[in-house]
């Protein structure tokens, strides 16, 4: 099981295939994604890598976190996430991952926080049809109607779909297709939409419900390996 990546949502655009059909894609940027810490079975009871991405200002980083980053010899990071990995996919602290970690055609799971919508009614939040426009209905056209209880049980069940806060929740979209990657610019293009607003941090992992395709770098798509391959081609 490989590590994932921390990426930042840039926005949406579209690509055209050779046949002329367009594919809507979301652009994700991988910036300074490095290993900050390593968890091993001997010391922690499980195996994982802690990644950090983005470059944070030193004055906005706590003293404890400054020491944490200094131990790994990396710059302060804006976002830190831990990914569970198998023992053969552990990485060294300070190692930098690139967009080449994923390949075109691969399926990935992307986790993030959805855009907050504030307090929303039942029609917007749960797609209720609302009440009648006429026939005695007044004022309450967009209400959710009866909550379905009587003297017994004399309460509204937990989880009842009603008006309330909408959005700003953590979700994972599964089995999204990687259309293309650009390791030089640190870009990953994923088909369709992903959770979050532009600029939001996302966790990109290998899809748990799909097999890894051939050509996926193991244990990870390290930036040093990509640069070495480019230098070899120039020579």
UniProtKB/Swiss-Prot annotation:
Record keywords, A-Z: Methylation, Ribonucleoprotein, Ribosomal protein, RNA-binding, rRNA-binding
Gene3D superfamilies (UniProt xref): 3.30.160.810, Translation factors
Residues recorded with modification N5-methylglutamine: 151
Annotated HAMAP family: Ribosomal_uL3_B
A GO CC term attached to the entry: cytosolic large ribosomal subunit
Record note on quaternary structure: Part of the 50S ribosomal subunit. Forms a cluster with proteins L14 and L19.
One Pfam family named in its UniProt record: Ribosomal_L3
Protein name: Large ribosomal subunit protein uL3
One of the record's GO molecular function terms: structural constituent of ribosome
Organism: Rhodospirillum rubrum (strain ATCC 11170 / ATH 1.1.1 / DSM 467 / LMG 4362 / NCIMB 8255 / S1)
InterPro entries the record matches: Ribosomal_uL3 (IPR000597), Ribosomal_uL3_bac/org-type (IPR019927), Ribosomal_uL3_CS (IPR019926), Transl_B-barrel_sf (IPR009000)
Record note on modification: Methylated by PrmB.
Biological function: One of the primary rRNA binding proteins, it binds directly near the 3'-end of the 23S rRNA, where it nucleates assembly of the 50S subunit.
GO biological-process terms attached to the record: translation
Recorded family membership: Belongs to the universal ribosomal protein uL3 family.
